[in-house]
């Protein structure tokens, strides 16, 4: 396939590098200074758990109208979504356009002016960019999520990722999945901000971990009561009221491990505008009531994280 990557942070770099290694022709939408480095060095990703490194060449294009593509992978932060969509209005033909990141508004947040077949998804990795290389790890509990659809381009994407060792799940209600996941992420990052963005500090702070888990449970319950479906099963189980102590223990262990930094803290510090926006959207959606008192306590009093 001819693939265009819009957004070359960790996610765009990792998935773009693997798609190139799988034999697909990868182009990258220009966004200096990052794409200046890509034009020279290509896309490079390193699995920090295995040490495996993948490199692929990529063509940097000045705008979305510069070529015809089968698949467009939009890997931008939620606060960059509107500007990314504006850049994509010049796409030629009818590509599959996969929005691949935090987006609690779901399909309704994507303007009709974006050409092609719009789909939703979410990555199954976390990591950091270091000197142009994306150091990453796969999240075993969260496979790459792709909208359940008959679009053959998403089927080819799934095949390519599976060949590259990625676990992939197809999600019927991707809109709901993204709403619940955004609520979860907003709570976790707010807890991290209370601890200066330091996952080790959060791991040792049981009152904040307990507040975080209470807030996640409340937000899930409020979304469910408002008619939102699509709650990921693993999160539904872990954050059921009966397993509160288990959830606190689980997140203490996770935050004290390398996963705390790779999967949560690094992005929380780097993308504070996005995380704040998720918290504001969640508060606006659920309101402030006794049923979400712990959620309000967590989100409304979270201080800025340390750089």
Can you annotate each of these PLM segments?
Residues 52-134:
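Rossmann-like NAD(P)(H) cofactor-binding subdomain of soluble oxidoreductases
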Residues 156, 160, 210-225, 277:
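A non-catalytic, amphipathic alpha-helix used as a structural packing/dimerization or gating element
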Residues 24, 166, 228:
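Short phosphate-binding/catalytic loops that engage adenosine nucleotides
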Residues 224-307:
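NAD(P)-dependent Rossmann-like dehydrogenase/reductase catalytic/cofactor-binding core
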Residues 1-51:
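NAD(P)+-binding Rossmann beta1-loop-alpha1 motif at the extreme N-terminus of oxidoreductases
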Residues 43-60, 185:
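N-terminal glycine-rich dinucleotide-binding loop that anchors FAD/FMN and/or NAD(P) in oxidoreductases
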Residues 103-181:
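Rossmann-fold dinucleotide-binding core
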Residues 175-203, 207-220:
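Active-site-proximal catalytic alpha-helix in oxidoreductases
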């Amino acid at each position: 396939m001819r693939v265009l990557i819009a957004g070359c942070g960790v996610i765009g770099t990792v998935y773009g590098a693997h798609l190139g290694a799988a034999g697909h022709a990868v182009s990258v939408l220009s966004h200096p200074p990052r794409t200046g480095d890509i034009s020279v060095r290509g896309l490079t990703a390193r699995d920090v758990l295995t040490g495996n490194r993948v490199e692929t060449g990529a063509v940097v294009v000045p705008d979305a109208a510069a070529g015809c593509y089968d698949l467009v992978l939009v890997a931008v932060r939620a606060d960059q979504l509107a500007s990314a969509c504006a850049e994509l209005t010049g796409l030629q033909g009818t590509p599959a356009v996969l929005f691949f990141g935090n987006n609690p508004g779901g399909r309704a947040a994507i303007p009709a002016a974006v050409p092609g077949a719009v789909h939703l998804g979410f990555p199954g990795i976390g990591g950091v960019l270091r000197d142009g290389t994306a150091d990453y790890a796969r999240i075993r509990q969260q496979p790459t999520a792709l909208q359940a659809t008959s679009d053959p381009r998403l089927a080819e994407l799934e095949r390519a990722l599976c060949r590259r060792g990625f676990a992939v799940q197809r999600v019927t209600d991707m809109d709901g999945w993204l709403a619940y996941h955004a609520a979860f992420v907003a709570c976790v990052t707010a807890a991290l901000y209370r601890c200066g963005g330091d996952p080790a500090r959060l791991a040792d702070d049981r009152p904040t971990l307990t507040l975080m888990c209470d807030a996640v449970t409340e937000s899930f319950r409020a979304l469910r009561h408002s008619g939102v479906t699509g709650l990921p099963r693993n999160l539904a189980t872990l954050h059921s009221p009966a397993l509160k102590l288990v959830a606190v223990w689980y997140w203490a262990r996770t935050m004290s491990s390398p996963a705390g930094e790779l999967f949560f803290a690094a992005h929380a510090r780097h993308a504070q505008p996005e995380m704040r926006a998720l918290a504001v959207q969640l508060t606006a959606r659920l309101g402030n009531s006794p049923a979400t008192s712990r959620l309000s306590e967590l989100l409304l009093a979270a201080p800025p994280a340390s750089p």
